[in-house]
């Protein structure tokens, strides 16, 4: 479980921003959204291939 401790004198908004950034880096929210509904194996392979193409394309430019 991901934890973010609120530092002394730190606002709640700042702590929430740190939590969101940490969850984004870990991919927790993204994985939860993907697992919300069943995804067929063929659709999963297709999605992963598309993500790989987009990642490769964006790294070239």
Curated annotation (Swiss-Prot):
Q: Does the keyword Ribonucleoprotein apply?
A: yes
Q: Which UniProt keywords apply?
A: Ribonucleoprotein, Ribosomal protein
Tell me the InterPro entries matching this sequence.
Answer: Ribosomal_bS21 (IPR001911), Ribosomal_bS21_CS (IPR018278), Ribosomal_bS21_sf (IPR038380)
BP-aspect Gene Ontology terms: translation
A GO cellular component annotation here is: ribonucleoprotein complex
Q: Which GO terms describe its molecular function?
A: structural constituent of ribosome
> Which Pfam families does this UniProt record tie to the protein?
Ribosomal_S21
Source organism's superkingdom? Bacteria
Q: What PANTHER family does the entry give?
A: MITOCHONDRIAL 28S RIBOSOMAL PROTEIN S21, SMALL RIBOSOMAL SUBUNIT PROTEIN BS21M
Q: Which family does it belong to?
A: Belongs to the bacterial ribosomal protein bS21 family.
Which HAMAP family has this protein been placed in? Answer: Ribosomal_bS21
Name of the protein this chain belongs to: Small ribosomal subunit protein bS21
Instruction: Give the originating organism.
Output: Methylacidiphilum infernorum (isolate V4) (Methylokorus infernorum (strain V4))
Q: What is the primary gene name for this protein?
A: rpsU
């Amino acid at each position: 479980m991901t934890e973010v401790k609120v530092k002394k004198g730190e606002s709640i908004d700042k702590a929430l921003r740190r939590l969101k950034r940490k969850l984004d880096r870990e991919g927790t929210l993204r994985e939860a959204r993907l697992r919300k509904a069943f995804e067929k194996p063929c659709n999963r392979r297709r999605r992963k291939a598309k993500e790989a193409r987009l990642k490769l394309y964006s790294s070239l430019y």
